[in-house]
């Protein structure tokens, strides 16, 4: 949108969001929009509208009303491996992502009951029926959700709401000013795109990381 003023870009962004049925509480033209990619996390006190697209990946949102502090990550695998620890990319993995993002809340002296936690994602996109004997072995989304629940519970964090699993991916929009999250289930084309992006990211992780 080069060539447009900041006000014009904000207005066009607002119209684009409105066309997708975004609730008025989230379609605030004054909020800068940030897209969260696989393996990324954000902790901020700025008012932002953060979007991300999930297939088998999961996101957890954290929000403190008292401090107006918000956090979110987009993790693709349940548990960080030893070979990946030195790479300084904790938000690729559910367990280390929770440690990294929630750690910023702990450093500010927040107690678990002061933090609103919501869980999203973990879809199963391989096309196997629930009773298929191999499903539990390749259900990365299910294992992501299970790990998130276990790690959050171990930290005394209650999940206030969640929308997880199923066979369709999700688009999220997280308002860091209010803690609200808007969720839209993906259509088949978007589902396939999200699946391909996650498969490419997992293949990259399987090769390890460079410490150059």
Curated annotation (Swiss-Prot):
GO molecular function per UniProt: protein-glutamine glutaminase activity
GO BP annotations listed: chemotaxis
Pfam families: CheD
Catalytically driven reaction(s): L-glutaminyl-[protein] + H2O = L-glutamyl-[protein] + NH4(+)
Coiled coil regions in record: none
Known EC number: 3.5.1.44
Keywords carried by this UniProt record: Chemotaxis, Hydrolase
Hydrolase listed as a keyword: yes
PANTHER family: CHEMORECEPTOR GLUTAMINE DEAMIDASE CHED-RELATED
Function: Probably deamidates glutamine residues to glutamate on methyl-accepting chemotaxis receptors (MCPs), playing an important role in chemotaxis.
Family as reported in the entry's similarity comment: Belongs to the CheD family.
Full protein name: Probable chemoreceptor glutamine deamidase CheD
Species the sequence originates in: Oleidesulfovibrio alaskensis (strain ATCC BAA-1058 / DSM 17464 / G20) (Desulfovibrio alaskensis)
